[in-house]
A protein has these predicted regions:
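Outer-membrane beta-barrel translocator/receptor signature
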Residues: 187, 202-204, 215-290, 296-303, ...
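Short, acidic, small-residue-rich periplasmic hinge/interaction motif at the N-terminus
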Residues: 35-41, 47, 77-81, 94-137, ...
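C-terminal beta-signal and adjacent terminal beta-strands/loops
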Residues: 549-550, 605-608, 612, 708-715, ...
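Outer membrane beta-barrel strand-and-loop segments of large Gram-negative receptors
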Residues: 415-437, 571-577, 583, 592, ...
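N-terminal periplasmic accessory domains that precede
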Residues: 96-100, 144-147, 162-167, 179, ...
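Gram-negative outer-membrane beta-barrel transporters
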Residues: 602-605, 623-712
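Short acidic/polar hinge/loop motifs at secondary-structure boundaries
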Residues: 63-66, 183-210
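Periplasmic-side early beta-strands and strand-to-turn transitions of outer-membrane beta-barrels
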Residues: 263-362
Length: 788
């Protein structure tokens, strides 16, 4: 691990020292313009790079770069925008050049046939959605899963109001990779109630890659990838500071998140910047329409520090380090001491006792600490392309606490408290990762390529009485190649990857359970290919087919104990084989200045699909109480569906949006529907926006949204503990703007009203739907105050 990081640093330093200017040079003046609808504005902080030089545009969108009097390929890129490459012939006498850049809009596809998509995403024909900073600002303070719910095809697996896990086209956890600051987020993500340990206040941009992404990102991206990009660090001399405040009425949550950004430029035109942010949150018990959900409060304390040094010659090195700490209560109504009360609670559908509002967090509960360090370096290499190296380290400390212990007499309160104060299960996960890729390799005039290698070393240690998974050490290695062939109106893409994973399991023995020392080895290949065709000026057709695999995870093989967060007893299966998937995605995109839509079809065929499903006939009775039993199994299955998203804008200020998704999942082994497949849903919104409203508010908006969720009528009645809940309709209002004048000038605020009818409902993907309803009406106030 340490040798690998040293090797990456050695390659980085040697490549910098090898850069030489060739021949005579001249100065090229570059301007960058931001195009959105009918406006053209200068665009700052655009990275301009040749094979041996580079620059960053200033606030006016200008930059000067030295180029040799030979043929030059100049690339331009900026997070959230479609980049590209242009070739300057040796015979050119041009002294100025203008780049026009289009933003990757929220829900819009970041696809343009004339752009160099390989330098951004790898497989150019894949389906990509972008959530920009401006949209994220309107949802700060919610969980990552809640923030993502408005993306078509994305749902959330909810475990109470504080735990929300993204589900993309029916897949989550081991099949959906979440990348944070350039490295895969590793934090016991196999648990359905283990939400990503990411501070939503510190996110700059979110990119959602739909469909099989295993070629570039490995087996964990079988169902797609969610890429979390921290805020930009400006390469200009600056000092900025702001404070974001947020409050919610349902659980009386309060949050504060101050940030500070500083940057400078040196005489050499090198640039250095730092950004720091701290977030604190506290929330009490959440409320449904009729009652309080006992012990659902939580606290968070998070921090993030970023730094970036950009060389005038085009190289850069940056780091991100973050700390995430949370303590959250687990709904008391889900932990029940005996089998009869468990069945009665499921039959009643509401808690067996009433609770009052409080900020106190009692047992059962979870405490999670997550530390992350990411170091990334980029180097343009003459005649090859752009070399990127990433080193990552993460440490995850998860403690889960019991609420019951039947071995202790009911009148021995002191003894019970002494036992419960220690975690029933504590998991310590440390992960090292290293990735090197060479991208934008210009094979010839039409073909560009990316090659890369990746590695990961992971160790898991267990403490406590509960032994859900054993101790293990895991090594993963992978190598891949991706190529894009670009014609005038079509891009053809393809790629291949091979991975090997080795898992060493430590011996474990109890009177009822034995795990011997063992080494598990898995290997497999992934392939992907497709095209993006510019059918008309405003219409594009994309198709992608991928074949991916993933090895079984340790929890799927060895689980045999209580999983406290989900309040269920989970049993693994040791003879599971690798899971394989063949995915077909087709998307039609249409985009003009006032009408845009995106229609997608997808089909996933699984060989050896690994699933966790209830064994309703045999609830498990333990000394900690009675719990529903869930078992891992492997079947043949298929998932398929359709998604639609469209916008119609009237007079550039009023927009009507419509989006919907439908997914079907079938267990081909039994002939029954798959368990926990998201329900069909349709959402439509009316959004009004003004650059200036009454000369008081700038960027003012108001939005009314209605979401319709259909009852899931495709289920196996002999499998689950209760039938799916009825469908429901939710109505939300969101409004806000920025104050233009006076002592409060520059303050941005928005107000959200969720579930304004205070509807009593249950979502099929809620882990607590057996015991309680979802939350009722909620009012959210957000305010960002600029300090410097």
């Amino acid at each position: 691990m340490y040798y690998f990081s040293g090797f990456v640093l050695f390659i980085f330093l040697c490549s910098i020292s090898a850069q030489q200017l060739v021949g005579q040079t001249r100065t090229l003046h570059i301007s960058t313009i931001h195009i959105q609808q009918h406006s053209k504005k200068p665009l700052a902080s655009v990275r301009i790079a040749t094979y041996n030089n580079g620059a960053m545009t200033d606030a006016a969108g200008h930059a000067d770069i030295f180029i040799s009097n030979t043929e030059q390929a100049i690339s331009f890129s900026k997070a959230g925008y479609i980049g590209g490459t242009i070739t300057i012939p040796a015979s050119s006498n041009d002294t100025s050049l203008t780049f026009t850049m289009q933003p990757m809009e929220f829900q819009g596809k970041a696809v343009q046939v004339t752009g160099d998509r390989n330098s951004v995403y790898g497989i150019a024909s894949q389906d990509v959605n972008i959530i920009k900073t401006e949209t994220l600002d309107k949802h700060r303070g919610q969980t990552l899963g809640e923030t993502l719910k408005r993306v078509t095809g994305l749902h959330t697996l909810q475990t109470g109001p504080s735990i929300s896990k993204p589900v993309l086209r029916g897949m989550h956890s081991q099949r959906l990779l979440i990348s944070n600051a350039g490295i895969a987020q590793e934090g016991q993500q196999w648990g359905s109630e283990h939400a990503p340990e990411i501070d939503a206040f510190s996110i700059g941009t979110i990119e959602i890659l739909k469909g099989a992404a295993g070629v570039e990102y490995g087996p964990g991206a079988m169902g797609g990838m969610i890429r979390i990009i921290p805020p930009d660090i400006a390469d200009t001399a600056h000092l900025h500071s702001s404070i974001t405040l947020q409050s919610q009425s349902n659980n009386w949550q309060g949050a504060i998140s101050p940030s500070l950004s500083w940057g400078t430029r040196f005489i050499s035109n090198d640039a250095f910047g730092l950004r720091a942010q701290i977030t604190a949150k506290q929330a009490g018990n959440a409320r449904t329409t009729d009652y309080v959900l006992g012990n659902t409060g939580f606290t968070e304390l998070n921090g993030q520090l970023q730094g970036k040094y950009s060389f005038s010659s085009g190289e850069s090195i940056q780091f991100t380090t973050s700390s995430f700490d949370t303590e959250l209560g687990i709904f008391k109504g889900s932990h029940i001491s005996n089998a009869s009360d468990l069945l009665r609670a499921i039959e009643l559908g509401h808690p067996l006792q009433e609770y009052d509002f409080t900020y106190d967090i009692d047992f059962p509960k979870q405490q999670i600490k997550h530390r992350l360090l990411s170091i990334q370096g980029t180097i343009p290499i003459q005649g090859l392309g752009l070399l990127e190296a990433t080193y990552g380290w993460q440490f995850n400390d998860r403690s889960e606490f019991d609420a019951h212990n039947l071995r202790v007499p009911k009148d021995s309160t002191f003894l019970l408290e002494q036992l419960l104060v220690k975690p029933a299960m504590r998991l310590l996960l440390e992960t090292y990762s290293g990735d090197i890729k060479l991208k934008s390799i210009q094979v010839d005039e039409l073909i560009s390529a990316t090659i890369g290698i990746s590695s990961q070393f992971q160790q898991n240690k267990r403490l406590g009485k509960v032994v859900l998974i054993p101790d293990y050490f895991m090594t993963s290695l992978g190598a891949y190649v991706i190529a894009n062939m670009m014609f005038d109106d079509i891009i053809i893409s393809g790629g291949a990857r091979f991975d090997n994973r080795s898992i060493s399991i430590d011996r474990f023995s109890t009177p009822t359970r034995l795990i011997n020392d063992s080494v598990l080895n898995y290997g497999g290949a992934s392939f992907s290919g497709g095209f993006m065709w510019q059918v008309l000026d405003h219409m594009r057709l994309a198709m992608n087919i991928g074949n991916t695999w993933r090895p079984p995870q340790v929890n799927e093989l060895y689980s045999y104990d209580i999983h406290h967060g989900t309040a269920q007893f989970e049993i693994g299966k040791r003879d599971l084989s690798p899971e394989k998937s063949t995915t077909l995605d087709i998307a039609l995109l249409y985009d003009t200045h006032n009408i845009s839509f995106d229609f997608s079809l997808f089909h996933n065929q699984f060989d050896g699909f690994i699933l966790l499903q209830p064994d309703r006939a045999r609830p498990t009775i333990t000394v900690r109480g009675s719990f529903p039993t869930f078992r891992y199994d492997q079947v043949q299955s298929v998932m398929y569906g359709a998604e639609f998203q469209g916008d119609y804008t009237v007079d550039d200020w009023l927009t009507f949006s419509l989006q919907g998704s439908m997914i079907r999942g079938d267990n081909l082994t039994t002939g029954n529907p798959l368990f926990m497949i998201p329900s069909d849903r349709i959402s439509n919104a009316l959004h009004a926006h003004r650059e200036s409203f009454l000369d008081v508010f700038g960027d003012a908006f108001i939005e009314f949204r209605m979401t319709l969720v259909r009852m899931q009528n495709r289920f196996d009645p002999n499998l689950d503990y209760t039938n799916p809940p009825p469908g429901y309709s939710l109505y939300d209002i969101n409004l806000g703007g920025t104050i233009l004048h006076g002592p409060l000038k520059g303050i941005s605020a928005n107000l959200s009203f969720q579930n304004i009818t205070n509807l009593a409902y249950r979502d099929y993907l809620s882990r607590y739907r057996y015991f309680a309803m979802d939350t009722g009406f909620n009012c959210i106030v957000r305010m960002t105050i600029p300090i410097l």
